[in-house]
Regions:
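Extracytoplasmic
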Residues: 1-3, 21-23, 92-95, 138-140, ...
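Bilobed "Venus flytrap"/periplasmic-binding protein-like clamshell domains
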Residues: 2-65, 69
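Residues in well-ordered beta-strands of folded domains
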Residues: 7, 98, 144
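Sec/Tat-exported extracytoplasmic proteins
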Residues: 10, 25, 30, 43-50, ...
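Short intrinsically disordered coil segments
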Residues: 20-24, 112-115, 158-160
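Pocket-lining segment of extracytoplasmic ligand-binding domains
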Residues: 44, 50-138, 149
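Segments of small-molecule ligand-sensing domains
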Residues: 126-182
């Protein structure tokens, strides 16, 4: 599961819902990416659009750096929770990981997103990062192959994906992913 992480500058009052991000400076994933689409889909459900928020679409590393420099009020990142960039942002004392308290409701309105929880202390038990359970939404990553791909290659791909991804992550249980259909 690839969660959608939203980080706020600590100096920005945490809005009760994402609707409170209207009028803010938001750094978004690259325009046209699935990550940007997910972020814009969630924001649109709360009435936040390009017309009423200042959205900048940057590459992930540039987006994180701009957020950390204070050039934006909030940043949207859709990455695996064990990604080094996510860990860096979680550990930044000037940033707060924003919870989607309506994660189940979001997943009922946007069918490709699923609710997930990042447990308190999941990143660092000693420093207790994050300092609270954080409700998130995320999307599964799909691998689609051509119908004429040789079955042995398909089997090898499935075997490799199981080897790499079958373990527990910070937001999913062991064996939950990958799942095969078709």
């Amino acid at each position: 599961l690839q969660p959608l992480f939203v980080f706020l500058r600590r100096s920005v009052a945490e809005p009760a819902t994402p609707a409170g991000l209207a009028g803010r400076r938001l750094v978004m994933p690259l325009e046209g990416s699935a990550s940007a689409q997910a972020a814009e889909d969630v924001l649109a459900r709360y009435g936040v659009t390009r017309e009423n928020a200042h959205m900048s679409f940057l590459r992930i590393g540039d987006a994180a750096a701009a957020l950390q420099r204070g050039e934006h009020d909030a940043g949207f990142f859709m990455l695996a929770p064990d990604n080094a960039l996510i860990r860096r942002l979680v550990a930044d004392p000037e940033l707060v990981l924003y919870p989607f308290t309506e994660s189940v409701g979001i997943s009922r309105n946007i069918d490709y997103l699923q609710p997930a929880t990042l447990a308190r202390g999941a990143f660092d038990l000693r420093r207790v990062l994050p300092p609270r359970d954080v409700a998130l939404v995320g999307a599964t990553v799909n691998v689609i192959v051509r119908e004429d791909l040789h079955p042995a290659v398909v089997y090898a791909l499935l075997h490799a994906m199981n080897e790499v991804h079958q373990g527990q992550t910070l937001v999913s249980n062991a064996g939950q992913y990958p799942s095969q259909t078709g």
